[in-house]
């Protein structure tokens, strides 16, 4: 649903100067179209949401699941463009937020970067080899438990957070 700017699409690509500069640098203009519905899949009766690459940074994608009700979330990614930096760890950290917001397990499978599982309470298990978590090959086996509850965040989303801040601001003002 969300394309990577300059990797999967070029903003303002129809403006001649932008098209000329980008084509000169890369050799082509990517023309990928975003999906129009969530990637809900089902295996052995278990429904799950598939997020591609950086879609896990958008809370509204996973929070808007009340109707489709997947039991867990899978993120497939290739984080090689981050290199050996903090990037793959920061990208993986978004899964902690998504797991806590939705009350579901989040499984990230990465061809490069971090492969791991985040439980609904935010605990992480990552594929490791000799302490390394990046650019390793291996198999990770872990039991996950599909869940169907709708969390308070899924029901209220950003409005719930806004209400909390309004209440806190009111409490602070009343003390003054």
Segments the model singles out, each with a brief description of its role:
Residues 1-176:
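Enzyme catalytic cores with a strong preference for nitrogen-chemistry domains
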């Amino acid at each position: 649903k969300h394309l990577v700017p300059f990797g999967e699409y070029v903003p303002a690509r129809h403006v001649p100067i932008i098209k000329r500069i980008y084509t000169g640098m890369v050799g082509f203009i990517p023309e990928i179209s975003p999906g129009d519905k969530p990637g809900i899949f089902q295996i052995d009766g278990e429904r799950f949401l598939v997020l591609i690459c950086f879609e896990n940074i958008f809370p509204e994608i996973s929070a808007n699941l009340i109707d489709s009700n997947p039991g867990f979330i899978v993120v497939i990614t290739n984080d090689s463009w981050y290199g050996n930096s903090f990037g793959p760890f920061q990208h993986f950290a978004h899964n902690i937020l998504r797991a806590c917001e939705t009350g579901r397990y989040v499984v990230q499978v990465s061809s490069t970067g971090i492969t791991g599982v985040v439980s609904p309470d935010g605990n992480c298990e990552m594929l490791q080899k000799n302490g390394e978590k990046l650019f390793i090959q291996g198999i990770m086996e872990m039991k996950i438990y599909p869940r169907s509850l709708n969390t308070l965040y899924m029901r209220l989303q950003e409005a719930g957070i806004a209400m909390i801040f309004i209440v806190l601001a009111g409490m602070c003002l009343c003390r003054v």
